[in-house]
Amino acid sequence: MTNIRKTHPLMKIVNNAFIDLPAPSNISSWWNFGSLLGICLILQILTGLFLAMHYTSDTMTAFSSVTHICRDVNYGWIIRYMHANGASMFFICLFIHVGRGLYYGSYTFLETWNIGVILLFTVMATAFVGYVLPWGQMSFWGATVITNLLSAIPYIGTNLVEWIWGGFSVDKATLTRFFAFHFILPFIIAALAMVHLLFLHETGSNNPTGIPSDVDKIPFHPYYTIKDILGALLLILFLMLLVLFVPDLLGDPDNYTPANPLNTPPHIKPEWYFLFAYAILRSIPNKLGGVLALISSILILIFMPLLHTSKQRSMIFRPLSQCLFWILVADLLTLTWIGGQPVEHPFIIIGQLASILYFLIILVLMPITSTIENNLLKW
């Protein structure tokens, strides 16, 4: 008799995706982050569900309801901090996952890559609206500053901002709709992730060499299930280290002050995972220019397949491109640091130089370097 996992309509889907899936035999730990992102998403949905049971999306009670969760709800504090720090772990995994895709040329799977970029935008939108919900000072002013950027859009900008706010400023209507968005978006992310996997399984996984691995495939289970479980345990270890020892390490102290429209914090800044984009936004003196640079800094990923001029897919055998890749990583870390600094000398000029370097590496230096490496192969 045929095994039920191969015949049952539902189990067959699970079987083909996680059990009998042919996987390359040489994929490294950098390939673990897809499954870790899935775990992060499940964790965020579960902790978020329990938080939503006690949270109230009203300007008068939002801040107190979060305090109530931490003080009065059984294990509310751990659920709240797992959710807040879980977002940080989510973005760490996300950035590594995207970096892996850039390094090993995974962007040549066009559909998978494009869905991935849409996923990145959706996760960033979810994190942004989620940060507004505790209704602290940084929540309120972050929401005001970032939504205000839309007013830079010619002609319809001001109307668009007021439409999103549901009034003439960030207020009760804004908070209520942001809570609604924050609740629905993770389920959209889950659906997109399934489409992402669907397209990936059409082509099969890439591998570190960038060479087709059809001649050497192994079943996903038990090899990669065990490997993913190890990754998951390490992820949970790091998350719980954050939650139990330094829960506020990545947060902003200003968010422990209730939102006050009459008092602006000295330095308005988003969560750490948006700082690189925020630094690029601030490095351009013009408002519309800054908004375009901000969007371009992420949207540029869509054009990676067009900018790929190398005859090899992966960077593993291309030392010049490797150097550029790691300079890009260092540049992004520099931008993250600058995004958290006040707007004054020397941070302004460092931010501008780092922003120029970011676009220069991706749009100019990487394609040129790849062409040079192609010519070196002929020698």
UniProtKB/Swiss-Prot annotation:
A ubiquinone binds at H201. GO terms for molecular function: metal ion binding; ubiquinol-cytochrome-c reductase activity. It holds the Pfam family Cytochrome_B. Its cofactor is heme b. Keywords: Electron transport, Heme, Iron, Membrane, Metal-binding, Mitochondrion, Mitochondrion inner membrane, Respiratory chain, Transmembrane, Transmembrane helix, Transport, Ubiquinone. The keyword Glycosyltransferase does not apply. It is a multi-pass membrane protein. The chain crosses the membrane at residues 33-53, 77-98, 113-133, 178-198, 226-246, 288-308, 320-340, 347-367. The keyword Electron transport applies. Its main location: mitochondrion. Heme 1 (or BL or b562) is low-potential and absorbs at about 562 nm, and heme 2 (or BH or b566) is high-potential and absorbs at about 566 nm. Component of the ubiquinol-cytochrome c reductase complex (complex III or cytochrome b-c1 complex) that is part of the mitochondrial respiratory chain. The b-c1 complex mediates electron transfer from ubiquinol to cytochrome c. Contributes to the generation of a proton gradient across the mitochondrial membrane that is then used for ATP synthesis. The cytochrome bc1 complex contains 11 subunits: 3 respiratory subunits (MT-CYB, CYC1 and UQCRFS1), 2 core proteins (UQCRC1 and UQCRC2) and 6 low-molecular weight proteins (UQCRH/QCR6, UQCRB/QCR7, UQCRQ/QCR8, UQCR10/QCR9, UQCR11/QCR10 and a cleavage product of UQCRFS1). This cytochrome bc1 complex then forms a dimer. This is Cytochrome b. It comes from Muntiacus muntjak. The lineage of its organism: Eukaryota, Metazoa, Chordata, Craniata, Vertebrata.
